[in-house]
């Protein structure tokens, strides 16, 4: 019984470590710009850098839920709130400010 509990704890710890702690450096990698005028491309890049490890490169899910049709369930403001405050195992504030707004808008369009 102790080994099952230890294995479960280790698995959950590894999953949470994979999802969090990326820092707020999405804009730093390209001189503070997230793709110029193309907001959708910039949002997708921010997502891939900060969220894809849990939600999948194609939004199909994994450790985190499937987001392929998240816009049919949540509005942009609701998605932005989830990004800011976290939900379930998702840590709060992985993406902040304008980057969070871009990603929320991009995800809200996924219907």
From Swiss-Prot:
GO MF term (any one): electron transfer activity
Subcellular localization(s) per the UniProt record: Cell membrane
Classification via InterPro entries: Cyt_c-like_dom, Cyt_c-like_dom_sf, Cyt_c_BACSU-c550-type, Cytochro_C551, Cytochrome_c550/c551-like
PTM statement from Swiss-Prot or TrEMBL: Binds 1 heme c group covalently per subunit. The N-terminus is blocked.
Signal peptide segment: 1-18
UniProt keyword terms in alphabetical order: Cell membrane, Electron transport, Heme, Iron, Lipoprotein, Membrane, Metal-binding, Palmitate, Signal, Transport
Pfam families documented for this protein: Cytochrome_CBB3
GO (cellular component) term, any one: plasma membrane
Name of the protein in question: Cytochrome c-551
Source organism of this protein record: Bacillus sp. (strain PS3)
Lineage: Bacteria, Bacillati, Bacillota, Bacilli, Bacillales
């Amino acid at each position: 019984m102790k080994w099952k509990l230890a294995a479960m704890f280790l698995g959950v710890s590894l999953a949470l470590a994979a999802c969090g702690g990326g820092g707020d450096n999405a804009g730093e990698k390209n001189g503070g710009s997230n793709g110029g005028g193309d907001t959708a491309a910039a949002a997708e890049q921010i997502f891939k850098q900060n969220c894809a490890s849990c939600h999948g490169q194609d939004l199909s899910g994994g450790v985190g839920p499937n987001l392929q049709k998240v816009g049919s369930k949540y509005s942009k403001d609701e998605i932005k709130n989830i990004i800011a405050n976290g939900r379930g195992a998702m840590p709060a504030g992985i993406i902040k400010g304008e980057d969070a707004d871009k990603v929320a808008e991009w995800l809200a369009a996924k219907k």
